[in-house]
Amino acid sequence: WETCKEFLKLSQLEIPQDGTSALRESSPEESHALRKKYGGFMKRYGGFMKKMDELYPQEPEEEAPAEILAKRYGGFMKKDAEEEEDALASSSDLLKELLGPGETETAAAPRGRDDEDVSKSHGGFMRALKGSPQLAQEAKMLQKRYGGFMRRVGRPEWWMDYQKRYGGFLKRFADSLPSDEEGESYS
């Protein structure tokens, strides 16, 4: 039914006989208000936007969403909004508590008291800790480890297993197998 009603509204708009749009003939105050409301888009889409504004007036929900939600849902959404604000406030308080007193202002500046604090430097490397061994152990577990590749020294374990399994079969009979160096080939 809504689409039919909209179609009737559109068909009832009067279009002047001279071919100009009735929407463009407006007072300068209205055009100034529309330019202020829509900005630079009025140059290109002005007539369309004005027509849409007439057909679909702005709903009161867009003007005051919190009040409408409170009325519509009986305060349910209002409670959620208040809880989100409380959560943001508590998280910022927690962050301030973790940073400690006086460090919120100087968080971006480099610190001079490395021996007192656990501080990060250069992309996540933890500096050495001086203090309780328990705190040092916890920080070591969290420490990021970046570095070079590990280099294997000696034979790999799978090679030893391979030698045990085949009992050195290839070593025993390596002399009796034809080699490519001797030039012997089977045709």
From Swiss-Prot:
Subcellular compartments: Cytoplasmic vesicle, Secretory vesicle, Chromaffin granule lumen; Secreted
Designated gene of the protein: PENK
Main localization, broad class: cytoplasm
Family assignment from sequence similarity: Belongs to the opioid neuropeptide precursor family.
UniProt keyword list: Cleavage on pair of basic residues, Cytoplasmic vesicle, Disulfide bond, Endorphin, Neuropeptide, Opioid peptide, Phosphoprotein, Secreted
Entries under InterPro entries matching the protein: Opioid_neupept (IPR006024), Proenkphlin_A (IPR000703)
Gene Ontology CC entries for this record: axon terminus; chromaffin granule lumen; dendrite; extracellular region; neuronal cell body; plasma membrane
Propeptide residue span(s): 52-70, 80-143, 153-163, 173-187
Compositionally skewed regions (Low complexity) per UniProt: 88-99
Gene Ontology MF annotations: opioid peptide activity
Origin superkingdom: Eukaryota
Bias (Basic and acidic residues): 111-120
Site (Cleavage) location in chain: 49-51, 70-71, 150-152, 154-155
Phosphoserine modification, residue list: 187
Protein name per the record: Proenkephalin-A
Record PTM: The N-terminal domain contains 6 conserved cysteines thought to be involved in disulfide bonding and/or processing. Proenkephalin-A is cleaved by CTSL to generate Met-enkephalin.
Chain spans, region Disordered: 81-132
GO biological process: chemical synaptic transmission; neuropeptide signaling pathway; sensory perception
